[in-house]
Regions:
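A flexible loop/linker signature enriched in serine peptidases of the S9 family
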Residues: 8-44, 59-65, 80-107, 120-127, ...
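Residue-level detector of Asp-centered blade-edge/turn motifs that repeat once per structural unit
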Residues: 72-73, 135-136
Length: 172
């Protein structure tokens, strides 16, 4: 039996090759840029067999779906997503914030390992990402960036999203 591999990818983005060509041209031009990350709205979470066969898109929603991690028993997947920015009408103020920083609506979600039953766990006006389950599956730990995005703190909550609390205070 083969092990499944979970990953996030934009390979189904119809503009992926054009974006790649643009990035290559920038690098070849000698232009130096500060590090940046693109929360591409075409990121989705996939599973496949270890040899790449049986590729399945689990999240298949408009928005950045990435940073996935399995529960210890393999039945759940935690992930970060800004799908709310694409699935509802934003106010003018929200639209301006999102255009300035596409991580503005980044919250944590959980879904079954087959991609069903997606549930939003956090609702924060800042970036929530990098979620992991505790070994017994009762808690989730993640990072939450401050509003300017310059530092992050470690947070924890119950596996159902209740009892959120900050564990560190280094950057605040």
């Amino acid at each position: 039996t083969q092990d499944l591999v979970m990953f996030s990818s934009t390979h189904e983005d119809p503009n992926a090759l054009a974006k790649q060509a643009e990035e290559i041209a920038i690098r070849e031009s000698g232009i130096e840029r500060a590090y940046g990350w693109d929360y591409d709205r075409n990121y989705d979470i996939y599973v496949a067999n270890g040899d790449g066969s049986n590729l399945i898109n689990l999240s298949n929603a408009d928005g950045y779906d990435a940073e996935g991690s399995y529960s210890a028993d393999g039945t759940k997947i935690l992930f970060a997503s800004n799908r709310q920015a694409y699935s509802r009408t934003l106010s003018q103020a929200e639209q301006a914030l999102f255009e300035d920083d596409s991580s503005y609506f980044m919250d944590l979600y959980v879904m079954n390992a087959d991609g069903s039953d997606v549930t939003q766990l956090t609702r924060s006006p800042v970036y929530d990402g990098g979620p992991f389950y505790s070994p017994d599956g009762s808690k989730i730990t993640w990072r939450r960036f401050n509003p300017d995005g310059n530092s992050a703190e470690i947070w924890t909550m119950d596996a159902d999203g209740r009892n959120q609390r900050q564990l560190t205070a280094a950057g605040m």
